[in-house]
């Protein structure tokens, strides 16, 4: 007798879980690595990653689309997460990422003298000025989510993520608009992506440890 394969609905239900969405979000949030293959004209060491999304940059829509999709994946992941601190932090992180994308920079000050002059005399747009606020919110919520993950898992790698985020946060404040600021931010973004992957791993482990009567361990319980 032929064995009936899993239905499309069942497959979608298995994919619709926080761990999967967090993995996709981590990949999308790391889309800035495409600058290694694209002629962006920005400095890997001195330019901020957000400058890739600036209004005058040729590949801005590639990076903006990736950030928006990544934020949507975080929103989808938050629906089935546990832990109030983690859920709130992920929601704020997603919202701040969307705001960061919508309130994009007018230009890339790290490589454009005219842009720096416009910033000095205050002739940039409101979105350009508010971008720093949304960036701080993004970092703060990512740090809070990492702290929540560390509190839930008590694992050493979660502690490393928190420590790296805190360290790069301090260095970013010290090196604001200075040489090396871009490199510090890129280390910070890689750390955030690592935190998302660790969150996915923790989610899979928690799901695997759940055993519903009559179902094998690791299966998705009925809603």
Region annotations inferred by a language model:
Residues 1-7, 209-223:
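Short, intrinsically disordered terminal tails adjacent to the first/last structured region
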Residues 8-206:
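Hydrophobic, aromatic-enriched alpha-helical segments typical of multi-pass transmembrane helices
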